[in-house]
Amino acid sequence: MKRFDIWLVMKNPEKGRVVDNLGLCTIVTPDELIELPNLIVAPMTTESENIESRVQCRFDNAIGYIMVDQLRTIDKFRFIKKLGELESDVQLRLCDCLLEFFAL
């Protein structure tokens, strides 16, 4: 497991206006902290608008979005299967989006 990996994670229903089932996600936890029991992830979706807090990407021949505004921490036992890794240009755009999202 490492930062920018794309994983299929165990579905976990949530309440309110958050994504109900994570499905695909990107790990955003820094590699220096990857040994912790929980990781910070950004859910991925193909059903979104291209808004400032979403990073557009292509994965598995589909256009999708990494939802920086839906970050969450999940236990490692919920990670089912590694499916790939973000391309380097998407990694840079995701880092820029995270910096802007958390700017004070």
What are these regions, as identified by a protein language model?
Residues 1-104:
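Conserved functional hotspots at enzyme active or ligand-binding sites that engage polyanionic ligands
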